[in-house]
């Protein structure tokens, strides 16, 4: 077998393989013998069909099967011999086969990039220094009250935290636009759901009023035809509602599973949950900075085939979130996911190299701790722990998380780390925007 390897472009490779005629003939003859033992042809006993009849009836299909098998087996042998690491499915291109002659074919594919990590010491990380303070707990308790509030209609003017029901009709340069019109639209103020200026234009008005507000669509607005455009919205304010906060009493406290119904019990539970969230937020903030730095100082090419596979994964995940099916998932434009998919492939390859070059193995104590941490958010933690222990796929997922954390710690040990004091709210908001 003769093998030659050439680079087509970037990570593209073409392997050309020539199989000696004798090897092809031997494989075809062997397969014809196997076929002759199995086939039934009228006028002949099973296993007694003359070889010339078998060749006449089955020769062409046997040759096709043999060539297909030879191409795959010899390609695998060739990449092992040449120490090539292919990425994605190969594409076979056989030349025309002629009896008694050598058989030549080529295979095109991509390879994984050769990665040599560099400049790890230049990665900069700001480690958040933060704790859950009493005022953070107070604010969270007030948020819980707002979440449990009832809404009561009022004749007063709209306030910054009220809820309104409106009809609106938007126009740009006097022309209505898609998605710019709604009836009986319920809007909780202060949540930033609408474009800048929309909510502010409603504040101060009363139910029954009709008015127009002027706004500007942001330059980064998702609809291309509206980016940066000035718009007018005709508003009919149909209803204004204010929150009626529940009393901070035993009945309210017991809604959150606090058996003794005490303020101290609720504060302790809220603090525990906030500290768990904070721990995750700090960990995620550090991890995102480490990975951003790793990607910045280690630019690599990635195989298009692997990016395509990742795009398909993201398409399916997106379709599932919005109740779509497989067909609808594949119809989603690849442009929506291409940048994210490429980023995920780059990060995966770079972290894989960190893991490989440092010979990291998942720390089972860390795996156990991660499962216990996740389980602590449930009412029956032990049941969750046991469920994970019986599910090998879930256990492997947690091991991958642990291994990724270990890789991040290795990188963190080489990075320039500084500390920055922050608050609970600042850090949580940063993580939401990331």
From Swiss-Prot:
The highest taxon in the source lineage is: Bacteria
Which processes are annotated in GO (biological process)? 'de novo' cotranslational protein folding; cell division; chaperone-mediated protein folding; protein transport; protein unfolding
Primary enzyme class: isomerase
* Keywords linked to the UniProt accession: Cell cycle, Cell division, Chaperone, Cytoplasm, Isomerase, Rotamase
- Give the chief site where it resides: cytoplasm
Family designation: Belongs to the FKBP-type PPIase family. Tig subfamily.
Q: What is the protein's given name?
A: Trigger factor
What organism is the protein native to?
Photorhabdus laumondii subsp. laumondii (strain DSM 15139 / CIP 105565 / TT01)
